Structure formats: C-alpha cells, structure tokens
C-alpha cells in the first residue's frame, strides 16, 4: 500500500525551491487495497483443511506487504481503527462539507457542500472528478445524468435520507418536523410520518426489517412502522438534540444514536433500552458511524473537530473510575444501568471545526470525514511498526507538532497550494454534468409509457415495459396500447431500418425494405477495415411469417420491482 505522507523534508520538498512552488509537482500517491485482498485470498484456507488463521503482522515495516483487509481480522476490531491521516481534499467552492458517502463499490466518494452542490472524488487517489449543481432532491445515474427532480419534497431543509432494504423506497427527514416515505420509481410520496415536535435531524431504515428510526431536536428517538405510519415507541434517553441515528449493518439488533448532550448511546432492539453510553467528548457530538465489518467499532465526530473511536467490548475507563457491569453480564439485564465506554483512540485535532459527517469505505480500511472547515479528510489504519502518527498535528496540535519538528507551518502552506493547483487541473479534466433535456430519454436507454406498477419511463433500469403476450393469449388480457420502445440498430448507419419490439404490421415487409442496401453497407464496413464472412448476402430474404409474440425473447425486460417495505 502507498499512502499520502504528511511529513517530509521541509527545506526542499520534492525538488521545489524554498519559498516557491516551481519545479516538479508532488507525485499523487494512492491507496491500493488490492494487494491486501490478494494476500488474503492466496493464503486463506477453509477450516476443514486447517491453518485458516494466518500469521499476524509483526510491528516491523517489512511486514507491510503482509497486511490483510479488515475482513481477515473479523475478531480483531482494534486492527481497523483509523489512526493515520492519509489525505485531505478541498473543493473549488471552499464551502463546508455536510455529507460524505462512498459508492457501493468503493471507487468514488460523493461529498455534499453547504451551498447545495456535490462533488465526486476518486476513492483511490482522492483526486477531484466532477462537481454537480445545487438543487432539490434529484435522481442521478452513474453517468452523471440528472434523471429526475422532486420539487417541494419538504417545506424546510432536508436533513437526512435513508433507503429501504429493497431500494424501492426511501425515507427523508426534514426541519418541517415530518418524515416522508417516497416511492423511488413513481417519485411520489407514499406516507407522511408526524409525531415529532421539532426539527427532525436524522433517520434510518433497518437493513432487514420494516422498521424506521428518527432523531429530533425535541430530544426524542422514535421508532416507526412504515406500513401503518404509526409510531411504535419513543426513547427519552438523550437530554438534547439527537444528531444521528444509525442501525448496525453487522449486528442488526443494535442502534447507535448521538446527541448534543456530549454522549452517544447504543440501544438493543430486543430489550428496547440503551446498553452502552459513549462518553469522553468535551463538546456536542455531531455525527457517528458504524464500521462495516466490526460491529463493536463506532466512530464519532464532535463540534470541536475531534474524532473518537470506541470499542464496545473495551470500556477504557480513565484512571480512578470504577468499571460498570454490562447489561449482558448482569443477572438482571433489564434493570442494570448502561455500561460506560470511553474512546479507545482519540484524534483531538482531526478538523478545525465541526465534523458534520463520517462514512466508511465498504471494505472498512478508510474512513472519510467532512467538516465545517471545508475539508474532506481520509483516515486509515497504521502500517506495521508505524508510530509516527501519534506525534502528527492531528493528534497533538499544530503548535506542538511544529515544536517537535514533525510538522512545519510553511511546508503546510506550500502543500496546500500544491493541492489547490492539482484540484484545479483535475477540475479542468473532470467529467461534465450532463443535464437531461426535458421530455427526452437518455442516450442509449429505451423509454416507454408503462402501466402503473410496472416500472418507470423516466428512470431507466428501474422496471421495464411489459413483455409481449405469448401466442394464443386473449386480447382482453393483453396490455393496452403498444408499450414497446423503438430499438434502433447500427445508429452510425443512417440507411439501417429501425426495429421495434412489436411485430410488424400486417402485409408489411420490413426485411425487404428498399431503404436497406446491403451493398452500400458492405462498402461502409470495408472502408473501416471490417472483413465480412464469405457468402455475405447482397439483399435480405423476405420473411414470410413474423415472429410470434413480437420481438426477440429476452430483449424486452420483464422485471417487476419489489415494492415491499421490508424483506
């Protein structure tokens, strides 16, 4: 793995003259998680063959090549604590970052700014890729086409979104005191959840159950049934605004919440009570996140810019405090007070202002943080034998790091200018926000009018047109109208006929059209260096009988989305 190095020789970094930025640009280092995955896949063996537990890396730089992904250390969450700063990114607008989210495959990171625009960063080299305009709730495809916009989704700011397990619904939380459940394909509001008395700051959808949770400025945590829009129960454990509510994706029985009362709590859904209280922050906690692999590792961010990591199985009590008993270890778990947990690792100066958002890479080796100081920073675990991170400016502060010689303020300014230059160059080469022309489909994506419940004509890939009926089906059972989209073939050749999924009209001879000139087609292909096979026909043979049922089987999608709320 290659990581970004925040240290180095201050006198002449990377060949640049003192006090200037002329000379070769600093090489962009990347994080290559592929090497650790390959190492794990090559060395692991199933349990029935023995030797499935591999040798642990020793504290030496020579063991760097033996680093394994967090999945190989499921029972050792301490190895995945992100203690080392990798890189920091800042957008051209230089506005506070309110949300960061990794794409499901982990190749890119999406960040949302205070002005409403959002940016896309490369997840390996952390370079800027593209920027999007601000606006309302919008649907985007990976090719950066704005597919759809929901105007006036709420009457006030939308604070959080959460997806259903089937990805057909999503939940929104707003400062207008309501939560709304939207149908993704129909782009309509199905249910409005009311019950909070103040701004709703966070929400989440259980990964396997039909259960919703929300946190509000009224200090309450509420559970909801998405089918009936009924509030199931309310928790009153916090004494100030609830800033984050997150279900664990590893242990589905756990819920974590954070609040401005400087604490975070872990609830067990089976007992419907808190089992852990996370203390240690000196300012209100603004966000938290679960590790995607280890259910006992929680990271929290505070309004003073500190980043703390907690291990639920290690209390880490300060000296002089009496340890408390976990409810699980008590003979009376229902009445035992929640166990107090203190951080296993503290990054006191992670940001210069409030940390508003945290998100883990899907593999669990990189943590991204977004802050009011306009920076998006990336954190990772330490390499074998590495301890220098304990003396960097993020752990002991800029003044102390400068006094110890581990960081230079002048070098930091030059480094910032270099990064800004690189971001400007990346933006010049970035992808373009491709706006969809109103009333038109996306290039290469078929669209068609479809009956309700069969998908969406505006959201390609979500549902599809109804397939043609099989031969002998009664006309009363067939779908109304022709819902089969045109399917142009060879768009580069204007003389090729357009085909459709529907059968040809009675008496028509589409395969013997005078517009089809195979001789001309053969010349065009030969000019491009394409050799046709021997016996290539010079004209089409008329088809006496059209395909029964219309079109070719498999060309028309017949997938009907699952509109259930839960699994």
Swiss-Prot record:
Primary subcellular site in the record, as a coarse category: nucleus
- Segments traversing the membrane: none
Q: Where are the WD repeats?
A: 92-131, 153-192, 195-234, 237-277, 280-320, 350-389
Q: Which SUPFAM superfamilies match?
A: WD40 repeat-like
One GO-annotated biological process of the protein: chromosome segregation
Q: Where is the composition biased (Acidic residues)?
A: 418-430
What SMART domains does its record include?
Answer: WD40
A UniProt-annotated Pfam family: WD40
Question: Where is the segment annotated Disordered?
Answer: 1-28, 416-478, 545-567
Tell me the domain of life. Eukaryota
Please provide the record's keywords in A-Z order. Answer: Chromosome partition, mRNA processing, Nucleus, Repeat, WD repeat
Q: Where is the composition biased (Gly residues)?
A: 548-557
Enumerate the subcellular locations listed in this protein's record, separating them with semicolons.
Nucleus
PANTHER family, alphabetized = PRE-MRNA 3' END PROCESSING PROTEIN WDR33 (PTHR22836:SF0), WD40 REPEAT PROTEIN (PTHR22836)
What does the UniProt function comment say about this protein? Required for 3'-end cleavage and polyadenylation of pre-mRNAs. Also involved in chromosome segregation where it has a role in chromosome attachment to the mitotic spindle.
Q: What is this protein called?
A: Polyadenylation factor subunit 2
Q: Which organism is it from?
A: Emericella nidulans (strain FGSC A4 / ATCC 38163 / CBS 112.46 / NRRL 194 / M139) (Aspergillus nidulans)
């Amino acid at each position: 793995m290659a990581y970004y190095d925040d240290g180095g020789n201050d006198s002449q970094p990377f060949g640049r003259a003192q006090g200037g930025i002329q000379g070769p640009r600093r090489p962009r280092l990347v994080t290559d998680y592929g090497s650790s995955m390959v190492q794990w896949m090559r060395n692991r063996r199933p349990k029935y063959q023995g030797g499935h537990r591999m040798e642990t890396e020793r504290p030496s730089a020579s063991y760097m090549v033996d680093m394994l992904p967090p999945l190989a250390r499921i029972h050792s969450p301490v190895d995945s604590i992100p203690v080392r700063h990798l890189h920091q990114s800042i957008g051209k607008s230089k506005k506070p970052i309110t949300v960061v989210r990794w794409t499901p495959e982990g190749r890119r990171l999406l960040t949302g700014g205070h002005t409403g625009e959002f940016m896309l960063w490369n997840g390996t080299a952390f370079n800027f890729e593209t920027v999007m305009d601000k606006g309302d709730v919008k649907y985007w495809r990976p090719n950066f086409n704005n597919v759809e916009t929901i105007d006036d989704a709420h009457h006030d700011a939308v604070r959080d979104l959460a997806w259903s397990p089937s990805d057909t619904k999503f939940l929104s939380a707003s400062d207008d005191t309501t939560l709304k459940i939207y149908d993704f394909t129909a782009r309509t509001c199905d249910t409005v959840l009311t019950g909070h008395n103040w701004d709703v700051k966070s929400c989440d959808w259980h990964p396997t159950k039909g259960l919703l949770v929300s946190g509000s400025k009224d200090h309450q945590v509420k559970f909801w049934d998405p089918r009936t829009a009924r509030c199931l129960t309310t928790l009153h454990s916090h004494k100030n605004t609830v800033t984050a509510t997150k279900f664990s994706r590893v242990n589905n029985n756990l819920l974590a919440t954070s609040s401005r009362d400087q604490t975070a709590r872990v609830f067990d859904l089976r007992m419907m009570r808190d089992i852990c209280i996370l203390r240690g922050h000196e300012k209100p906690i603004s966000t938290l996140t679960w590790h995607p692999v280890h259910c006992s590792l929680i990271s929290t961010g505070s309004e003073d810019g500190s980043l703390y990591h907690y291990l639920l199985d290690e209390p880490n009590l300060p000296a002089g405090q009496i340890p408390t008993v976990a409810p699980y270890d008590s003979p009376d778990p229902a009445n035992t007070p929640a166990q107090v947990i203190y951080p296993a690792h503290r990054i006191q100066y992670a940001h210069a202002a409030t940390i508003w958002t945290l998100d883990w890479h899907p593999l669990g080796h990189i943590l991204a943080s977004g802050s009011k100081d306009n920076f998006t920073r990336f954190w990772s675990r330490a390499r074998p034998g590495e301890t220098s991170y304990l003396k960097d400016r993020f752990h002991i502060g800029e003044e102390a790091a400068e006094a110890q010689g581990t960081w230079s303020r002048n070098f930091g300014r030059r480094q910032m200018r270099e990064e800004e230059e690189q971001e400007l160059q990346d933006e010049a080469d970035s992808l373009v926000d491709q706006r969809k022309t109103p009333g038109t489909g996306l290039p290469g994506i078929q669209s068609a009018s479809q009956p309700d419940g069969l998908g969406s004509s505006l959201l390609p890939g979500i549902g599809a047109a109804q397939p043609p009926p099989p031969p002998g089906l009664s006309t009363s059972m067939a779908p109304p109208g022709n819902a089969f989209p045109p399917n142009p073939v060879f768009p580069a050749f204007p003389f090729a006929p357009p085909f459709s999924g529907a059968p040809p009209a009675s008496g028509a001879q589409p395969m013997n059209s005078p517009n089809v000139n195979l001789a001309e087609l053969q010349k065009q292909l030969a000019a491009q260096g394409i050799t046709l096979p021997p016996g290539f026909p010079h004209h089409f043979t008329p088809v006496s009988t059209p395909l029964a049922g219309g079109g070719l089987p498999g060309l028309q999608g017949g997938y009907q989305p699952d509109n259930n709320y839960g699994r």
